[in-house]
UniProtKB/Swiss-Prot annotation:
Keyword Lipid metabolism annotated: no
Protein known as: 4-hydroxy-tetrahydrodipicolinate reductase
Pathway info: Amino-acid biosynthesis; L-lysine biosynthesis via DAP pathway; (S)-tetrahydrodipicolinate from L-aspartate: step 4/4
Catalytic EC class: oxidoreductase
Annotated organism of origin: Lactiplantibacillus plantarum (strain ATCC BAA-793 / NCIMB 8826 / WCFS1)
Location in the cell: Cytoplasm
EC number per UniProt: 1.17.1.8
Any single Gene Ontology cellular-component annotation: cytosol
The keyword GTP-binding appears for this protein: no
Gene name per UniProt: dapB
InterPro entries tied to this protein: DapB_C, DapB_N, DapB_N_CS, DHDPR_bac, NAD(P)-bd_dom_sf
Lineage, broadest ranks: Bacteria, Bacillati, Bacillota, Bacilli, Lactobacillales
Length: 261
């Protein structure tokens, strides 16, 4: 039985993760945390009536025997949350994006020092993991590429962690290249999107969307588009479940769900 605490349970991803833990007979939800809440018990939330699980709204309050910390909070909170988990011997499974490379490196060092496993996943959807792998393969042959990520309009950070991770994987194998006409101008600033290693990333925010990404490659006389769609947040729970099951087997902090698959 894996004992789990879920951080960010008031949000849509966090509440979905909490329900996944409750529904899984191999997991036990032993606590929830959300700095926005003043509830003392998860059962006070209308979505979780009948559940008797301690709820915390301050890290200093947390007393738990959890071995896994699922985090779907916000970019400004996730780093401190992950440090708290690692310092208490709890393996973090982090779906919150927005941390800097320096923060990730510090967490990886802390995990190694504490001999605690952990995972930071820009995306827990299996289709998104496959998209990144396929895009990396295609980039060996198509150095001209643009990334378009599309999310719901409540998403705070842009571009998405998945788009950045996709760009990093492409950059590992792509021939260095500055795309487009070197004399090109923008009538409206930002029209060509954000620049990363010579390629462009575009972020779309609209109501009705959940999480979607297209990677478009172009070559002489041909093109290739790889697309992934998450239509419901439940699609991410397969990856979260895998992470919860496996993360305690390791003694380091991985970045990317593919390391556990």
């Amino acid at each position: 039985m894996v004992k789990v605490i879920v951080a960010g349970y008031k949000g849509r991803m966090g509440s979905t993760a909490a329900q996944m833990v409750i529904d899984n007979p191999d997991f036990e939800l032993v606590g929830v945390y959300d700095a926005r809440s003043e509830e003392q018990n998860l059962g006070e939330d209308d979505r979780f009536k009948g559940q008797n699980v301690p709820a915390f709204h301050d890290l200093d309050q947390i007393k738990t025997d959890a071995t896994v910390w699922i985090d779907f909070t916000i970019p400004t909170a996730v780093y401190e949350n992950a440090k708290f988990a690692l310092n208490h011997g709890i393996s973090p499974v982090i779906g919150t994006t927005g941390m800097t490379d320096e923060q990730v490196a510090e967490l990886q060092k802390l995990a190694k020092d504490k001999q605690v496993g952990g995972l930071i996943a820009p995306n827990f959807g299996i289709s998104a993991v496959l998209l990144m792998q396929f895009a990396q393969q295609a980039a060996k042959y198509f150095p001209d590429v643009e990334i378009i990520e599309m999310h719901h309009d409540d998403k705070i950070d842009s571009p998405s962690g998945t788009a950045i991770s996709t760009a990093k994987k492409i950059a590992e194998v792509r021939q260095p290249k500055e795309q487009g006409n070197p004399d090109a101008t923008e009538t409206l600033p930002g029209a060509r999107g954000a620049e990363y290693e010579g390629m462009r990333i575009h972020a779309v925010r609209l109501p009705g969307l959940v999480a979607h990404e297209e990677v478009m490659f172009g070559g002489p006389g041909e093109g290739l588009t790889i697309r992934q769609d998450s239509f419901d947040r439940i699609s991410f729970m397969t990856g979260v479940k895998v992470a919860v099951e496996k993360v305690n087997q390791y003694h380091e902090l991985f970045v990317g769900l593919e390391h556990l698959l």
